[in-house]
Amino acid sequence: MSQVKYNRIILKISGEALAGDKGNGINPTVIGHLANEIKSVHDLGVEIGIVCGGGNMWRGETGAKLGMERAQADYMGMLATIMNGLALQDGLEKVGVPTRMQTSIEMRQIAEPYIRRRALRHLEKGRVVIFGGGTGNPYFSTDTTAALRAAEIGADVILMAKNGVDGIYSADPKTDPSATKFAELTQLDLISKDLKVMDRTASSLSMDTEIPLIVFNVNTPGNIKKVVMGENIGTVIRGDK
């Protein structure tokens, strides 16, 4: 494993990335692509934890704006992340990657409950672990879940896999031709520049734990492997220094 820069990672996959061009739901072709991309990293001996978003199916904030009780809407979002996780688990197992699904809300018929020590043992044995259900608490995003699980398992980095976005820009490059891409930022930069990369709870936790994040385009073949190998793609976000 001397050729890899990061030996244990948290891969945060947005729900939108799982939907692909469809915009919502789960795209089996995308699942297959991601499974092969993750397998290429797993084959290097890297220990991989995965957190899936649920925005391709449901967002708690959206439900709350429509008049639902926020906590109830957030629980629906947690279920969406579990559905995404199960789809990804199926894809990974089809390409021969041993995978375990753990959920913060107990669903013993379909997944293990989240137990930190058990997750660590799975990682040590070369199994990919998918963390579903968010933190298990309403009002917390899956970005916060990624930061939390990264701290709990001692991850070297959080990889923020984005759908068609190859890093962080000063403005939307699709609408502003003068937008510039940042090679490196700090968590304080995200807050001061009001860059909508992750919510402030997730940003604060990442700053406290000093676990770096890398935002990159997951749609480009080989990008996950390139990041793990230390190639300079995407945008690196560090603590407060």
UniProtKB/Swiss-Prot annotation:
- One of the record's GO molecular function terms: ATP binding
Give the EC number.
Answer: 2.7.4.22
Span of the signal peptide: none
Transmembrane helix found in the keyword field: no
Q: Which UniProt keywords apply?
A: Allosteric enzyme, ATP-binding, Cytoplasm, Kinase, Nucleotide-binding, Pyrimidine biosynthesis, Transferase
Which superkingdom, per the lineage? Bacteria
Recorded GO cellular component terms are: cytoplasm
Q: Provide the catalytic activity annotation.
A: UMP + ATP = UDP + ADP
Question: What controls its activity?
Answer: Allosterically activated by GTP. Inhibited by UTP.
Q: What is its main location?
A: cytoplasm
List where in the cell it is found: Cytoplasm
Which InterPro entries does the record associate with it?
A: AceGlu_kinase-like_sf, Asp/Glu/Uridylate_kinase, Uridylate_kinase, Uridylate_kinase_bac
Q: In which pathway does it act?
A: Pyrimidine metabolism; CTP biosynthesis via de novo pathway; UDP from UMP (UMPK route): step 1/1
Q: Where does the record place the region Involved in allosteric activation by GTP? A: 20-25
- Give the binding site residues for UMP: G54, D74, T135, G136, N137, P138, Y139, F140, S141, T142
Q: A GO BP term, please?
A: UDP biosynthetic process
Q: Which residues are listed for ATP binding in this entry? A: K12, I13, S14, G15, G55, R59, N163, Y169, D172
- For the protein in the UniProt heading, the enzyme class is transferase
**What's one Pfam family the UniProt record gives for this protein?**
AA_kinase
- Subunit structure, interactors included: Homohexamer.
Report the sequence similarity comment from the record.
Belongs to the UMP kinase family.
Describe the task this protein carries out: Catalyzes the reversible phosphorylation of UMP to UDP.
Q: Tell me what this protein is called.
A: Uridylate kinase
The species this protein belongs to is Lactobacillus acidophilus (strain ATCC 700396 / NCK56 / N2 / NCFM)
